[in-house]
Amino acid sequence: MSISLTESAAQRIVAFLDNRGKGVGLRLGVRTSGCSGMAYVLEFADVVNEEDQVFEDKGVKVIVDGKSILYLDGTELDFVKEGLNEGFKFNNPNVSSECGCGESFHV
C-alpha cells in the first residue's frame, strides 16, 4: 500500500503546515458525495488515530483512515497551477470514472 507526493505537493503541504504552526501531517480520505459517488477529503491532522495508516514521502506524513485506504492505494498527490487556478490534483489508479465537473469519482 502506498500514497506518494510530487515535489510540488510536498512543498505546498510543508508551507501550509508551517503557516498553521501545528499538525503532524495531512489527512487524506474519501467520503460519499457528488454525482459519481465519492469525493476526496483533505484536512490537517493534529493526531494519528489507532486505525490510521501513515505514509511518509519527501518529509511529509500523509495519514489515511482504514476505510479510505481501499480507495486511495497507489494515489499520487500533486499540486498544479493552470493559468489563474491552482490546487491539489489526485492521480488515483483506482478510479474507473469521474464526473464532468471533476469533483467526484467512482472506483
Swiss-Prot record:
InterPro entries linked: Fe-S_cluster_asmbl/transfer (IPR050322), FeS_biogenesis (IPR000361), FeS_cluster_insertion (IPR016092), FeS_cluster_insertion_CS (IPR017870), HesB-like_dom_sf (IPR035903), IscA_proteobacteria (IPR011302)
Residue positions binding Fe cation: 35, 99, 101
Cofactor binding, note field: Binds 2 iron ions per dimer. The dimer may bind additional iron ions.
Keyword presence, S-adenosyl-L-methionine: no
Keyword entries, A-Z: Iron, Metal-binding
A Pfam family: Fe-S_biosyn
GO molecular function terms listed in the Swiss-Prot or TrEMBL record: 2 iron, 2 sulfur cluster binding; iron ion binding
The keyword Nucleus belongs to this UniProt entry's keyword annotation: no
Cofactor: Fe cation
GO cellular component terms given for this protein: cytosol
GO biological process, any: iron-sulfur cluster assembly
Record-annotated membrane-spanning stretches: none
Domain of life: Bacteria
Described function: Is able to transfer iron-sulfur clusters to apo-ferredoxin. Multiple cycles of [2Fe2S] cluster formation and transfer are observed, suggesting that IscA acts catalytically. Recruits intracellular free iron so as to provide iron for the assembly of transient iron-sulfur cluster in IscU in the presence of IscS, L-cysteine and the thioredoxin reductase system TrxA/TrxB.
The family this protein is said to belong to: Belongs to the HesB/IscA family.
Misc remark: A transposon insertion between iscA and hscB prevents colonization of the nematode Steinernema carpocapsae. The insertion disrupts cotranscription of iscA and hscB but does not reduce hscBA expression, suggesting that coordinated expression of the isc-hsc-fdx locus is required for colonization.
Subunit structure: Homodimer; may form tetramers and higher multimers.
NCBIfam families with a match to the protein in the record: iron-sulfur cluster assembly accessory protein, IscA, PRK09502.1
The protein's name: Iron-binding protein IscA
Species the sequence originates in: Xenorhabdus nematophila (strain ATCC 19061 / DSM 3370 / CCUG 14189 / LMG 1036 / NCIMB 9965 / AN6)
